[in-house]
Amino acid sequence: SALAAGCPVVVKAHPGHMATAELTAEAIVRAVVRCGLPGGVFNMIFGTDIGAELVRHPAIQAVGFTGSLAGGKALYQLAQQRPQPIPLFAEMSAINPLIILPQALQTRAEALANELVASFTLGGGQFCTRPGLILALRCAGLERFKSALCATVAGSTPQVLLNAPTLQHYRQGVAALAAHPRIEKLASGIAAGAGQAQTLLWQAQVEDLLAQDTLLQTEVFGPLSLLVEVDDEAQLKAVVKAQQGQLTATLHAEADDGPLAASLLPLLCEKAGRVLFNGYPTGVE
C-alpha cells in the first residue's frame, strides 16, 4: 500500500529468517526494475537495533509494525518523541477470542472441537490470528465439546517453532499459565521432543477474565488455547467488553442463537479489526 501511494519503503528484516527475507527482497527489486520504478524505491536492511534508528530518522514519515505489544509500544514512544511526531501503524499481539453460542455447541460440538484445534495449532500456533481464547456458554452441549476438545488435543503432534527464542518464549508462557493458581491444564498433546512445542489446552475462570487478569490477556505464541466457561448472556457481554483490542473475534452460532449473536456483534466490532462468523481466524489474510 505504501508503494501504491507513491512512497519509497525501507523494510527491517526479521532476524529469524534473514535468508528468506533476502530472497524476497531480490524478487521485489526485480519487479521494481521490470515496472520501471525509480531505483531505491524499495530497500531492506538487517540488524538488531536498527529498527529504532529507522523510526528516529527524519526521512521516515510513517512506520508499519507487526510484533509484540511491548515492541509496538516502544516504537510508538520513539515515533512520538521525534521533533515532528509520525504515525505508527501497528499490528500487535492479540488473543483473538472465539465465542461459541449454545445452539452451535449442541449441534456441532465434535466438529467444532476438531476444527478449533486444527486452527490454534496451524503453523505451530504461530499465526497472529490464532484463537487463543475460547468462550463457551454453559449449556447442554458444553461437556461434549470439552470432551472432544481434550481428545483432539491429546492426539495432536508436537511441532517445531520458528527458532529457539520463539520456543523459549512459548515455554515461558506455558510456565506462567502453570503457575497461576486458578488456571487448570485440561489436556496435553503428544509429548514434545527436544526443540519441539507440545500442544496444550488450559481452562481459566471467568471471574479472572472479568477482572482483566493480565496473564489472561497476554498472547502466548504457540500451539495452545485457553477455555473459559461463561454462565449466561449478560456475563458473556461483560467478558467481551472487558477484552483489550484484538486482531480478530469469531462467533459460532446457529439460527436459534440469532438474537444473542445480533446483540454481540456491535460489541465485537468495537474490539476487533475483523469479526468472523462460523469460521476460524487463522483463515484471515
Role assignments for model-derived ranges:
Residues 1-35:
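Conserved small-residue-rich beta-alpha loop and adjacent elements
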Residues 11, 44-46, 65-67, 88-91, ...:
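General beta-strand structural signal in soluble alpha/beta enzymes
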Residues 16-20, 70-73, 95-99, 258, ...:
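Short gly/pro/ser/thr-enriched loop/turn and capping motifs at secondary-structure boundaries
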Residues 23, 27-34, 62, 70-211, ...:
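ALDH superfamily catalytic-core signature
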Residues 36-39, 60, 118, 134-136, ...:
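Conserved C-terminal structural/oligomerization subdomain of aldehyde/semialdehyde dehydrogenase
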Residues 42-64:
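A structured beta-alpha segment of the ubiquitous adenosine-cofactor-binding alpha/beta core
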Residues 43-47, 100, 226-231:
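Short acidic-hydrophobic, aromatic-tinged amphipathic segments that line or gate anion-handling sites
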